[in-house]
């Protein structure tokens, strides 16, 4: 069987299960969950992997799921397909969860549907029998940067070290055997179609600063006070002054959150 014939068999298997794959994405869209709290979503992914005869490992970096499909053509590289479990916080969105503000406005529901769809295609078409190495399907938690105060509390309690799910998976060794990883992402750019394969991905870290003021009578004794808001404004202005030094090709992004 040629490579193109094998790809065609996988495509046909995906088409046969298209309704099931779409249903996965829709189920996740209806029940958005925030990072490291994607219990329902990860349980759905686990169920789908088990239905394919895979043996997923769960609870990785709290809610991550990994299932390995071993090729029948001998040893080879380990290739990871990645999907992200979590939703954004957009409280004003019409589909936002009323209690958490979570909504899949970044399309991670479609990502996970694609991850499950790829697993369905490779397994149902018996493509792994003809491939060497392994294909690893990984559903990762907490790609988005919201809910930071909760995550920082988890760090202080020793349950997390990093604020993002991929960083935690790396720290815990769950990606040590992976030679190559890729993912798709929905895109707002018409020239990319409905989804794209990113050429690169930014790393991310978070910093927290606390500005402490001192209360004073605004009319009678303003000189006795310290305005914490002014201090925060100065800090943001200093950060903004750095932006012109960022090189476009480095795709540096700075997103302050003031609470």
Report residues per predicted region.
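N-proximal short alpha-helices
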Residues: 1, 14-18, 22, 198-208
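Acidic/His- and Gly-rich active-site-bordering loop/insert found
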Residues: 3-105, 109-136, 141-142
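Histidine/acidic-residue-rich, glycine-tolerant segments that coordinate divalent metal ions
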Residues: 90-103, 109-110, 122, 129-257
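Intrinsic structural disorder
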Residues: 1, 6, 27-28, 179, ...
């Amino acid at each position: 069987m040629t490579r193109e014939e094998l790809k065609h068999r996988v495509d046909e298997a995906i088409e046969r299960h298209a309704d099931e794959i779409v249903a996965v994405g829709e189920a996740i869209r209806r029940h958005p969950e925030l990072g490291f709290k994607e219990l329902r979503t990860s349980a759905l992914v686990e169920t789908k992997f088990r239905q394919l005869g895979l043996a997923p490992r769960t609870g990785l970096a709290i809610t991550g799921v990994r299932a390995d499909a071993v090729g029948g053509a001998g040893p080879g590289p380990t290739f990871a397909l990645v999907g992200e479990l979590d939703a954004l916080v957009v409280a004003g969105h019409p589909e936002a969860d009323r209690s958490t503000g979570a909504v899949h406005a970044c399309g991670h529901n479609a990502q996970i549907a694609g991850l499950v769809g790829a697993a369905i295609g490779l397994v149902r078409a018996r493509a792994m029998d003809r491939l060497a190495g392994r294909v690893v399907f990984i559903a990762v938690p907490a790609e988005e940067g919201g809910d930071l105060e909760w995550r920082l509390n988890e760090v202080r309690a020793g349950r997390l070290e990093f604020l993002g799910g991929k960083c935690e998976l790396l720290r815990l060794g769950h990606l040590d055997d992976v030679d190559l990883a890729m993912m798709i992402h929905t895109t707002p750019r018409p020239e990319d179609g409905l989804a794209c394969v990113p050429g690169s991905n930014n790393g991310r870290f978070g910093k927290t600063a606390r500005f402490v003021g001192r209360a004073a009578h605004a009319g009678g004794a303003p000189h006795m006070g310290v305005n914490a808001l002014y201090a925060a404004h100065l800090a943001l202005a200093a950060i903004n002054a750095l932006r012109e030094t960022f090189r476009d090709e480095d795709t540096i992004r700075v997103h302050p959150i003031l609470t």
